[in-house]
């Protein structure tokens, strides 16, 4: 598994992990943050099939750009609207109390406050024996293409490391 950490303009620190499962390339994107007394807490995890997830991000970006243009042309100062876009998720909770969620809701929102647009991906994770987790990823207009680019770049690094590891292992058979 390869890991890449990216910091978004919207203020999130995301960790991208790559692996192959049953012949399918998988990416998992975890929000990474620090709490008092604890560092490197993974809160929630999006992604799955890498090509599907990137396609969902592109669709989200397209809708986001359309709504930004509409808001600017109409001088919208404040709005909060659910975006009609699907985002994949994994039920794996990446934090210190790791486990599988029994229910996950992932919903992107288009939000403008004082004429400043952003996309919020809101994530609710429900577990058998715990208080539900709630997390928000704040993404600026530049963050979604940046995230897609980081996924591609990180995956290429993952492939290069996997290939090198395989070559090294073959030397010592």
Where are these regions (language model features)?
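Positively charged, low-complexity terminal tracts
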Residues: 1-173
